[in-house]
């Protein structure tokens, strides 16, 4: 987590009201990782998102799956296309199984990010897997 975000870590029950009632340190860390990804810092996003996914207070399956979609994008954009496609395929399967339409939309955007490598073996395998899941 970045130095600026470190002061957000001590969240107590008084802070959990209204719009941010379901936010905890882990969810904030996922948000930071997503921002790093979108700011073109995939290596930093990989570290941040992996850390978030390993924390004990990762109590929301939806947040974990969103983190895994963004982690897959970060792997792919950092040159680890095979790992990115593997993580995205596994996550897409989980999202489809639970009927998480917002998560599937997020995964579709991740697939769009890897379009420049559409003829590479890992991407072709991912696309075949997605087609079979959607069939």
Language-model region placement:
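Conserved binding/catalytic microenvironments
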Residues: 1-135
């Amino acid at each position: 987590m970045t130095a600026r975000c470190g002061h957000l870590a001590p969240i107590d029950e008084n802070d959990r009201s209204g719009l941010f009632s379901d936010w905890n340190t882990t969810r904030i860390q996922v948000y930071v990782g997503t921002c790093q990804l979108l700011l073109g810092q995939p290596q930093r996003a990989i570290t941040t998102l992996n850390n978030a996914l390993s924390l004990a207070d990762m109590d929301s399956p939806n947040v974990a799956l969103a983190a895994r979609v963004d982690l897959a994008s970060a792997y792919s954009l950092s040159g680890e296309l095979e790992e990115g496609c593997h993580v995205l395929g596994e996550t897409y399967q989980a999202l489809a199984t639970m009927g998480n339409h917002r998560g599937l939309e997020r995964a579709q955007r991740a697939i769009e990010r890897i379009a420049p490598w559409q003829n590479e073996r890992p991407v072709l395998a991912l696309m075949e897997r997605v087609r079979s899941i959607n069939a």
